[in-house]
């Protein structure tokens, strides 16, 4: 199963190419996957982003390590995570997979957004260090979340890319320069 998924992920690899970041500043990345009743959503897109991130940092290919760790972790998934919506969190670094954890997940309800300038934010790689994102989030002033603006362009919220539906054109629009190239954004 994984061999086919890894091959499919190569199709999406260009969607997640990033300029190389100084590898000394980034030592740990994370990938968060949604599972519905145990089935992974958009798995090839997540794999492509992980592979592109490793390439950008000059890290080893994690495909084999991920396959091995996932096989073990999925058998140890808590019973309450086998049904409904579950978040799988994969933490990895230059040497490979560090951990895979699971938790039940309910999307956060967002009814209000505050625009926050984020010209200083560089989050092209999904790092476990979200300090700069949380600094923006802390400026929400009573709103549920923030909508970050970089160079006068809408980018992302603190937890997701944005997608805007154009009723007349009957299609989704996403920012051309998001802070992080999201998997659902690439899927759209």
What residue spans do the PLM features occupy?
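Conserved alpha/beta cores of soluble small-molecule-handling proteins
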Residues: 1-153, 179-187
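Conserved active-site beta-strand-loop modules that form the wall/rim of enzyme catalytic pockets
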Residues: 142-173
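Short, hydrophobic/π-rich interface segment
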Residues: 165-167, 172-187
